[in-house]
Curated annotation (Swiss-Prot):
InterPro entries: Toxin_22 (IPR012627)
Position of the signal peptide: 1-21
Record has Nucleus as a keyword: no
Keywords assigned by UniProt, alphabetized: Disulfide bond, Ion channel impairing toxin, Knottin, Secreted, Signal, Toxin
Protein name (database record): U11-theraphotoxin-Hhn1a
Record-linked Pfam families: Toxin_22
Major subcellular location class: secreted
SS bond list: C75-C90, C82-C95, C89-C110
Domain of life: Eukaryota
Molecular function (Gene Ontology), one example: toxin activity
Prosequence residues removed at maturation: 22-74
Tissue distribution of the protein: Expressed by the venom gland.
Protein's cellular compartments: Secreted
């Protein structure tokens, strides 16, 4: 009975020690693979970042050109009600409260300066 226990104990110790060695080797292999993967991901990330920066530069360039050439957009003409806090009267007009006619509307209108 003692020989069976000793044999079992010996086999158990060998299995555990060999299993640990395999586990350490597997760990080292996984670390190598993840390091290689990280370097690839870093490269891909940098490449994507460069492309996005180029695209952003092109878009900003187009926006600046558009703003230089653009006309005034959607404005309110003379005699049209406007908002006191957000006047969108066309150039040369001011958002004012009416003096005589239209006082009963309690609204502001676009008038010439």
């Amino acid at each position: 009975m003692n020989t069976v226990r000793v044999t079992f104990l010996l086999v158990f110790v060998l299995a555990v020690s060999l299993g640990q060695a395999d586990k350490d080797e597997n760990r080292m292999e996984m670390q190598k693979k993840t390091e290689q993967g990280k370097s690839y991901l870093d490269f891909a990330e940098n490449l994507l970042l460069q492309k996005l920066e180029e695209l952003e530069a092109k878009l900003l360039e187009e926006d600046s050109e558009e703003s230089r050439n653009s006309r005034q957009k959607r404005c309110i003409g003379e005699g049209v009600p406007c908002d006191e806090n957000d006047p969108r009267c066309c150039s040369g007009l001011v958002c004012l409260k009416p003096t005589l006619h239209g006082i009963w509307y309690k609204s502001y209108y676009c008038y010439k300066k």
